[in-house]
Amino acid sequence: MKFVDEFRDPELITKAAEEIRRLADPNRHYRLMEVCGGHTHAIYRFGLKDVLPTNIELIHGPGCPVCVLPMGRIDDALSLAMNPDVIFAAFGDMMRVPGTHGSPLEHKARGMDVRIVYSPSDAIKLARMNPQKHVMFFAIGFETTAPSTALTLQRAKAEGVHNFSVFCNHVTIIPAIRAILDSPDMRLDGFIGPGHVSTVIGCRPYEWIAKNEHKPIVVCGFEPLDLLQSIVMILAQLQKGEAKVENQYKRVVPWEGNRAALKAMADTFQLRPYFEWRGLGFISQSALRIRDEYAEWDSEQRFHVPGIRVTDPKAAQCGEVLKGVLKPAQCKLFGKECTPENPVGALMVSSEGSCAAYYNYEHRKANLVTTLSSPA
């Protein structure tokens, strides 16, 4: 398959791994952050950590939108959906994310009208099929998914779909990276830049990382060779004492991004003054709110939102894992009280969560090795 097979070619992967070993200074410890949760899963899925030198440490970043959502936002939306005339619609990733009083799926078991949709336009269809009810779409994601929400809001207004609104939780990636770099306990040498987000925003917004923070950043694809090539490019910059933005994912990511998608977002959203991120606290201008022109389709403007603020369960260490301070397995609950079957935190639920990735690929593998090596 074009653009897949060649990026999984064993010979090319071996050559890239050899180039990494050649470039890596054995007297230096490298800490590289992969920002995107999709990269985290690819790293574990393809076993890439096993081919890297031991002095290259990959740090998992905050690029999982479900994971960074504070519990209070889930509680706010579910409180609105307690109304029997409201249908709560969301992507499947959200269904098992716990709020204070349970996940949307658990609320569904108690009688709440909760539906899985696969796109915002599905939520509009749901509203048309249920004219006697109000459909509230729980929108989530970085700039990757925000344009589709924006276009759906424009469509709802144009077509006069009045029993539909969006509970907007879209966040932006650049302020999150800035918050990571501002953290006093985080030392990083470079970034593996997000692929999906960059298809929308392009590469230019990352230039401040190179210019002001003197950190290399390479926008990267999701195949094994993509990730290894990106590490080669970062190491080459570090060896030369350079810090710049490079685009390894040129087959998908244009330097200037997707202008039509950016325009749709600008026409429909504006920046919030601040927004709470799980593990990172309140970050200024880091999330999107719906413009007043679309107030009728904004759940937060249309209904009274409690503005609930809650803390994560005390024993859970989601914040430290999200910031890259702890590895998933270093959390006290990991693999014990917190598993994919019984998640305590969002990082164990989402398809992009680092805890879910580690559990599914590393933890299970370690348990299998232990079982096979144990005497009968």
Report residues per predicted region.
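Phosphate/pyrophosphate-binding betaalpha-module
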Residues: F138, F142-P205
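Metallocofactor- and cofactor-centric catalytic cores in central/energy metabolism, strongly enriched
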Residues: M1-Q132, A146, A150, Q154-E159, ...
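A conserved active-site cap/scaffold subdomain adjacent to cofactor or substrate pockets
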Residues: F167, D185-P254
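Secondary-structure boundary elements
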Residues: M129-K133, R155-H162, S183-R187, K215, ...
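Hydrophobic alpha-helical scaffolding
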Residues: E6, C67, F138, F142, ...
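Internal helical hairpin/lid segments
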Residues: L228-E320
